[in-house]
Amino acid sequence: MIVKKQFQTLSLIIIQMIIDRIENASRYYALGNGLAQAFEHIKNNDLTEIAPGSYPIIRDKIRMLVFDSKQTNTDRITMEGHRKNIDIQYWIRGSELMGYAPLLSHNLLEPFNEEKDFGNCSADASFTRLEPGMFAIYFPTDLHTAVIDEKCNSSVRKIVFKVCVE
C-alpha cells in the first residue's frame, strides 16, 4: 500500500510491506533498480540447490542470503527492522507465518546495531502465511518476523536479498 500525505509544498510517500507472487514481481521494478535486479536474479537463476550462505550479487548494493531451516516453536516473538536495507524474502520450499508491524509501533529491545543494520524490537504484529513462489518486501519503515507455521511440518528454503537503500 502506498500512502501519500501533503504537508504544504512537501510531499511524503510512505511505502509499506508488499506481499505478492513472483510472477508479479515486475510490477515493483519501478520502486528501485536494486529491487528489479534482485527479482531478475530470482528469475534467471536456479536457487533450489545453491548452498546456504551469503552471496554478493552487486558489490555493496545487493547481497543474497540462502537459508535452509527446520521450523521451531518460539515462546517470545521479536520483530526485526533495518535502516539501510530493504529485505526481499522469497520462499522456495515450505511455508512460514510472517509477522509485520509498522516501525512506529515498536519498542526497541536493545540498542540498534548499525554495523549489522539490525534492530530487535517488540511490537504487535499482523501475520500472513507465505508459501513457495511468494515474496515479501520489507522497507526500512517495516518490522518483520518469521514464526512457526503449525500447518507446515517441513523445512523451509528461503532466499533473502538485502538491497541497499538508494
Predicted segments with their positions:
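Conserved metal-binding segment of the jelly-roll/cupin
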Residues: 130-147
